[in-house]
Amino acid sequence: MAIKIYRPTSPGRRHHSVSSFEEITKSRPERALLVSVKNDSGRNNQGRVTVRHRGGGSKTQIRVIDFKRNKLDVPGRVAAIEYDPNRTARIALVFYTDGEKRYILAPSDLKVGDVIMAGENAEPKSGNALPLSSIPTGTFIHNIEIIKGKGGIMVRSAGAAAQLMAKEDDYALVRLPSGEMRKVRSDCSATVGQIGNIEHGTLEIGKAGRNRHLGWRPTVRGSAMSPNNHPHGGGECRCPIGMTGPKTPWGKPALGYRTRKAKYSDKLIVKRRG
């Protein structure tokens, strides 16, 4: 993927960059793999805001992605590399020999015409999905399962890759992109390779309207609010927040305060991120 930079014909264009989309080979998605979902604008089933600053944006259709890679020992040919408006990674349309079509996350070096497969007998090459026990140590992987058969939930964004560091007994040691070292059961599957669209992190939004198209609404400063809406609010004109350190809208310390909840799977974390 290459980055396209515009001439500074306006303040928005001056700091504006987009993907060249040169790796995209098909513009229209596969209709059988589309699902329409209503935009919830950050609300839950009670209508309350659970994620701030979300809403609006371009209307999109969900592409049904095969995160489980449970079509075992059936080879498939990559028919197209497509753009997905709902994620940062590119997706690949795969035609399997039994006639089924599926979308998968596209690794960086996957090309149209490549043949991929999932299963214990698959070769550990880019795009193939295997159990961690069948993947050589040191291999870069993505779309990693935590529970066997549930589908990959880790390392799915553009340019991301984890590394298989070691295998011992029933567990494999994986280094995640955040630096966290985590144990994962060896019978869980992962896909070999690094996810494509590697330069996505270097894109510059450039203007507020582009964020609105992506479904992000403005972030209002707490000091600009009234005191009943934010701990920093109130006062006449510009004034200090009136406390020793900044707070979240719910009164918790905003800097350095641990917010990660304890989970049963925390015992599998060998080394924390950072």
Curated annotation (Swiss-Prot):
One Pfam family name from the record? Ribosomal_L2_C
Which SUPFAM superfamilies does the protein's record reference? Nucleic acid-binding proteins (SSF50249), Translation proteins SH3-like domain (SSF50104)
Question: Keyword set for this entry?
Answer: Ribonucleoprotein, Ribosomal protein, RNA-binding, rRNA-binding
- Residues crossing the lipid bilayer are none
Q: One MF term in GO for this entry?
A: transferase activity
Annotated region Disordered: where?
Answer: 1-23
UniProt record, GO biological process = cytoplasmic translation
- Can you cite an annotated GO cellular component? large ribosomal subunit
What is the similarity comment for this entry? Belongs to the universal ribosomal protein uL2 family.
| Quaternary structure note | Part of the 50S ribosomal subunit. Forms a bridge to the 30S subunit in the 70S ribosome.
Provide the function of this protein: One of the primary rRNA binding proteins. Required for association of the 30S and 50S subunits to form the 70S ribosome, for tRNA binding and peptide bond formation. It has been suggested to have peptidyltransferase activity; this is somewhat controversial. Makes several contacts with the 16S rRNA in the 70S ribosome.
Please state what the protein is called: Large ribosomal subunit protein uL2
Species this chain originates from: Dehalococcoides mccartyi (strain ATCC BAA-2100 / JCM 16839 / KCTC 5957 / BAV1)
